[in-house]
């Protein structure tokens, strides 16, 4: 009895489903939803006194061995506050082929860092960035509203995978650990 009922239902499904008409197409709206564009504001560092150099470091890295590029600097603001900047780029072995002179440059206005030459990596490199002594007003947002971002030449942004952005507004501190960079460009904290 079950077999007969199953055969009848299956035959009915085939007859109703295969009637020679054009297949059903999903509804496609005339206007596509606009993609939400997130706009981030970069976080400013306190003004450097005149004559303070741009912080930069260059290291020759053998891609088969890997290596580090580090910047650990500080400066005194016009208000006699100290700003500390501690940045470390870790390049694991075999992220790229050959040797390269890799330059890391800290921005003079924002909590941002740029790299050269232009490179794309077979495996991501890791970046740790920490600023301390920033204006607390620049950090007056809940911690979850901060991101570490890749910023292209047109100002478009993309969140960089990391262990997260940590903020301590009282100390004027913001940091990111193990940000995964797949290529060199400009990266910054944004809110």
Regions found by a protein language model. Give the residues of each.
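Sec-dependent bacterial lipoprotein signal peptides
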Residues: 1-16
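Bacterial Sec-dependent N-terminal signal peptides
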Residues: 14-48, 191
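Proteolytic processing hotspots in large secreted/extracellular or virion-associated proteins
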Residues: 32-65, 95-154
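Predominantly extracellular/luminal regions of secreted and cell-surface proteins
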Residues: 59-100
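Surface-exposed coil/turn segments at beta-strand junctions on protein surfaces, enriched
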Residues: 64, 120-122, 169-172, 180-182
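Aromatic sugar-binding surface patches on proteins
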Residues: 127, 172-173
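Solvent-exposed serine/threonine-rich low-complexity stretches and specific carbohydrate-binding patches
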Residues: 159-169
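C-terminal beta-strand-rich structural cap/linker in extracellular carbohydrate-active enzymes
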Residues: 175-191
């Amino acid at each position: 009895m079950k077999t007969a009922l199953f055969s009848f239902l299956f035959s009915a499904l085939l007859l109703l489903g295969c009637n020679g008409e054009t297949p059903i197409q999903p509804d496609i709206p005339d206007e596509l939803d606009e993609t939400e564009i997130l706009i981030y504001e970069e976080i400013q560092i306190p003004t450097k006194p005149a004559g303070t150099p741009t912080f930069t470091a260059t290291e020759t890295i053998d891609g088969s061995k890997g290596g580090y590029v580090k910047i650990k600097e500080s400066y005194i603001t016009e208000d006699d506050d100290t700003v500390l900047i501690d940045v470390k780029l870790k390049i694991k072995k075999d992220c790229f082929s050959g040797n390269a002179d890799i330059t890391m440059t800290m921005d003079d206005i924002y909590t941002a860092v740029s790299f050269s030459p232009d490179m794309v990596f077979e495996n991501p490199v890791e970046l740790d960035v920490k600023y301390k002594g920033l204006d607390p007003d620049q950090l007056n947002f809940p911690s979850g509203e901060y991101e570490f971002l890749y910023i292209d030449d047109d100002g478009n942004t993309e969140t960089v995978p990391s262990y997260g952005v940590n903020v301590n507004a009282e100390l004027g501190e913001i940091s990111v650990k193990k940000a995964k960079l797949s290529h060199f460009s400009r990266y910054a904290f944004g809110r």
